[in-house]
Every structure is written in structure tokens, then in C-alpha cells.
């Protein structure tokens, strides 16, 4: 395994040699420079993993802060630890603002320097892995659909992304709260920094406290695992998405509320760390009810819910199902090796007639299950038919291909049987198009007024939402 290259920049030869010896013993590969010219030349030849940089460099064209500025412009992810024997608080603050990873004064504790360096390298490694991962994994930041409600929601996401306010995303399980958070990050000014997800569900109070704020005091001196940065530190300059925020216990809510007031973390060792984070939270619960029942702090709710987004359920955007199915089939073909196939129109109709309590996640699972359980054999199963999808989906959706009363209709006069068919057929189509009169009439080939009369004649209820959706649709397609 190759050694980690570290550049030491100090005008004092003794200091350079001492630090180099320490790092060599710890398995690093130290490089040394006495001034800005040497330092920048070494970096130009081959960038290093980290830099230990003195501020006051006698006989150098640039001082440490000047070198730091150049490094952060050319190598933004490269961690720089500032050291100085003549530093002031103001100098330290300026260095951190300019992008230094940390600042320590001479004479420094050898162990402290090594721990700090290892931590800096670990953080940078994670950042690089995160960036690499973005180009390799499935694009999870695409909101698929062109229905009126989806287009409106996309516009709301764009507005939220342009704001620096905290955002709370409300939505049912599987509806796309995490996707919304990713989209906000992707469209924001923080897009080149980390997007971190924290889910407190199934975590103990102690574990949540450890992940967000650090180890307990009694553990501080026992091991070095607590030296790793907390999630709040990892997310610095980026976006932190807290999923199901209502699952955070009240004692941690109090600490989180305190953090939101000044964005500082007091580590168990006493060190104060200030961070700059965009915080987005998600919840499938009614937070106001949680507040009323004493399970969620009212003040915390108001601080997190500065901007609010409501994710539309899949039931509300059934028109997007054909596009979503095509999207999932393509993704599964690309990343799971399942052959790309077409879902028949009647299969799509059956999917649109289902209520989808599990939302987008459930639809994706159904598409995957269907492709796996119906492999192509001798040219068969190229087209996905209704009988191939899970039976529970068909059982709970209005079946357009086999009427429930088909046997009873054999004993009915034609007029009565036709009325039974029309009632079931139009009920299914209204459900499929989310009670939108315009879209239903267009699909079944009837004038809107004629469809209205037919529904009334068949005693089929027309919810008011159908008319509202219709108006929105007409405006969107004017």
C-alpha cells in the first residue's frame, strides 16, 4: 500500500526535520519546503494528501496565509493544518475562514498533531469518495413525471433550493422526501460540497448523541475512535438531511435546538467547533400533533420548519406512472442486468387504478419483482401483461380486463348488462385519471358534457378535486 504524502512547510529546519521524523514513524511519506517557492513547486509536480503549514516564513515570497490561499484555489479538497509559534486568535480565525482544516500553536503535542493529520486525511478521503460516487451510481436526483402536480412541485423545489432557509419536507413513507432533499442540494450553491443523510430511526439516544455531537466524556480518554468528526462536522459547508426528524428523542432535540442558535458544537474535550450547514428535515408524521402531545419541542419545530414542502403522493400523480415505469425499467436494466421490456397499456391501466400506500418506493419494487418473476423464455414475456404483476396489486385495483360481475351479466338483459359494464369501466377510468374529467373524457372518447351526464346517470360521484385538477391541467397546457 502506498504511503500518504504530506508536505511540511516551515522556515526552521529543525522543526521541519522533527515533524518529518514523527510522520515517518507513523507511516506517512513527508516532503519538506522552507518557503512558498519550494512548496508550490512540490505541489505542482505532484499534489499531496495534506499540508502542515507555518504562518510566519522568513525569507519567503509569501507567508503561510498567502500559500493557503493559493492551495485552496488550486486544490480545494487538500486539507491544510496551520502551525505557528507567534499566533493570535485573529490569525487562527482568518486561517479557518480561508479554508484551513485546523490551527495549532507551537510547541505542539506530537500525538495531537498526528491525530489531527489522520483525521484531516480521513475527512478528505470521504469527500473524494463522495464525489467519485456521484459519477458512478444511479442518478438519484431526478424527479420523473410531467403531470400538473409534479410540474408544480418541481417549481417549489427550485424556489426552496435558491433559499438559505431551513426546510422541512412533509410526505408519506416512500413518497420521495429524500429525493426532494437531494434535488434541493443539487440545485443549491452547496452542490460541490457533501450531502449527508442522517436517520435516527432505530438508533438509541446514546448513539444519536454520539453521531451528532461526539462521544461521552468518559470515553474521551479511553480510545481514539472518538477523535473522528461528528456528522455535523462532516456536513460543514454542505447539506445535512435528517430523515424522520420526529424520531429524535427530546434530550437530543434540546441539544439540536441549542446548535441551531449559533451553529457551534462543544466537543466533550471542551473544544468549540463552528460549522456552516444547510439543514433539511423530513417527516411522515404530523409534527404539530407531536408538538401538542409533548413529543417534539415547539421551538425546534419552528426553527426547522422555516420553509415547508409537501411531497405529493403517487396516488395524487397517477398520470406519472407510465413515465415512472419506463424509468425504473431502464434503471433496472442498466444496473441490475434485467432485460428492458415494455409494460402493456392494460398493465399500466391496472397500475394506475391501484392506490399505492407505499408510494414511489412500492411502485419501483413492483416493477423489479415483475421483471424478475417473469423472465423471457423462448421469446415469450417480451410484453408485461396484467396477470404478470403481483396478485395483490390486481386484487386491490379495478380490473379493466375481467369484470367482477361477468357471470351475473349473462343472465341480464343487454341494457342492464351494458349499464353494469359502463359503471365499472368509467369508475375505473375516473380512478385512473385521479377524477380529472378532462383527461378521462379525452381517453374514453367522450365530450366533457356527455361524460358529466353519463356519470350522473350512473350515480357515480364526481369529487370537487376533479374540477380543480382539470382547471390546473388546462392552464398548464394552454
UniProtKB/Swiss-Prot annotation:
Alphabetic keyword roster: ATP-binding, Nucleotide-binding, Phosphoprotein, Transcription, Transcription regulation, Two-component regulatory system
A Pfam match: Sigma54_activat
Specify which residues bind ATP according to the UniProt entry for this protein: 171-178, 235-244
Q: Name one GO biological process term.
A: regulation of DNA-templated transcription
Query: Which GO MF term does the entry hold, naming one?
Result: ATP binding
Looking up PROSITE patterns in the UniProt record yields: RESPONSE_REGULATORY, SIGMA54_INTERACT_3, SIGMA54_INTERACT_4
Residue span, Sigma-54 factor interaction domain: 143-372
User: Endoplasmic reticulum as a keyword?
Assistant: no
Q: Where is the Response regulatory domain?
A: 5-121
Q: Which CDD domains match?
A: AAA, REC_NtrX-like
The record's annotation in SMART domains points to: AAA, REC
| Coiled-coil positions | none
Q: Which residues carry this modification: 4-aspartylphosphate?
A: 54
Known role: Member of the two-component regulatory system RBE_0312/RBE_0470.
Its protein name is Putative response regulator NtrX-like
User: What is the organism field in this record?
Assistant: Rickettsia bellii (strain RML369-C)
Amino acid at each position: 500500500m502506498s504511503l500518504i504524502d504530506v508536505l511540511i512547510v516551515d522556515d526552521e529546519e529543525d522543526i521541519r526535520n522533527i515533524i518529518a521524523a514523527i510522520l515517518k514513524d507513523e507511516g506517512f511519506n513527508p516532503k519538506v519546503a522552507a518557503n512558498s517557492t519550494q512548496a508550490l513547486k512540490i505541489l505542482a509536480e505532484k499534489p499531496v494528501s495534506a499540508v502542515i503549514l507555518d504562518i510566519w516564513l522568513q525569507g519567503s515570497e509569501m507567508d503561510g496565509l498567502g500559500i493557503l490561499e493559493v492551495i485552496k484555489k488550486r486544490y480545494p479538497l487538500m486539507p491544510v493544518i496551520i502551525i505557528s509559534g507567534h499566533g493570535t486568535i485573529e490569525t487562527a480565525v482568518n486561517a479557518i475562514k480561508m479554508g484551513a482544516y485546523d490551527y495549532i500553536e507551537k510547541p505542539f503535542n506530537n500525538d495531537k498533531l498526528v491525530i489531527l493529520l489522520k483525521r484531516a486525511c480521513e475527512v478528505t478521503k470521504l469527500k473524494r469518495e463522495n464525489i467519485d460516487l456521484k459519477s458512478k451510481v444511479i442518478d438519484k436526483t431526478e424527479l420523473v413525471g410531467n403531470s400538473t402536480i409534479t410540474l408544480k412541485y418541481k417549481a417549489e423545489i427550485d424556489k426552496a433550493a435558491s433559499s438559505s432557509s431551513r426546510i422541512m419536507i412533509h410526505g408519506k413513507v416512500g413518497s420521495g422526501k429524500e429525493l426532494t432533499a437531494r434535488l434541493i442540494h443539487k440545485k443549491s450553491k452547496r452542490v460541490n460540497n457533501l450531502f449527508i443523510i442522517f436517520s435516527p430511526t432505530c438508533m438509541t439516544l446514546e448513539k444519536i448523541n454520539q453521531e451528532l455531537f461526539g462521544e461521552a466524556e468518559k470515553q474521551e480518554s479511553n480510545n481514539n475512535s472518538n477523535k473522528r468528526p461528528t456528522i455535523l462536522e462532516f456536513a460543514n459547508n454542505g447539506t445535512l438531511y435528517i430523515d424522520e426528524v420526529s424520531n429524535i428523542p427530546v434530550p437530543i432535540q434540546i441539544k439540536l435546538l441549542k446548535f441551531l442558535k449559533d451553529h457551534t458544537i462543544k466537543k466533550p474535550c471542551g473544544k468549540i467547533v463552528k460549522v456552516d450547514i444547510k439543514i433539511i428535515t423530513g417527516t411522515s408524521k404530523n409534527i404539530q400533533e407531536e408538538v401538542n402531545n409533548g413529543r417534539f419541542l415547539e421551538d425546534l419545530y419552528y426553527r426547522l420548519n422555516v420553509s415547508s414542502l409537501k411531497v405529493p403522493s403517487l396516488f395524487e400523480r397517477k398520470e406519472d406512472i407510465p413515465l415512472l415505469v419506463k424509468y425504473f425499467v431502464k434503471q433496472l436494466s442498466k444496473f441490475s442486468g434485467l432485460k428492458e421490456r415494455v409494460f402493456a397499456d392494460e398493465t399500466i391501466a391496472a397500475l394506475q387504478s391501484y392506490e399505492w400506500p407505499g408510494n414511489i418506493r412500492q411502485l419501483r419494487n413492483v416493477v423489479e419483482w415483475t421483471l424478475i418473476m417473469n423472465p423471457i423464455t423462448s421469446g415469450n414475456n417480451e410484453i408485461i401483461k396484467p396477470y404478470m404483476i403481483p396478485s395483490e396489486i390486481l386484487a386491490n385495483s379495478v380490473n379493466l380486463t375481467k369484470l367482477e360481475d361477468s357471470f351475473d351479466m349473462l343472465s341480464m338483459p343487454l341494457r342492464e348488462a351494458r349499464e353494469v359494464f359502463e359503471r365499472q369501466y368509467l369508475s375505473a377510468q375516473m380512478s385512473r385519471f385521479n377524477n380529472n374529467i378532462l383527461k378521462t373524457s379525452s381517453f374514453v372518447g367522450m365530450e366533457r358534457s356527455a361524460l358529466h351526464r353519463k356519470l350522473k346517470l350512473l350515480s357515480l360521484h364526481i369529487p370537487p378535486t376533479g374540477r380543480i385538477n382539470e382547471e390546473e391541467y388546462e392552464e398548464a397546457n394552454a
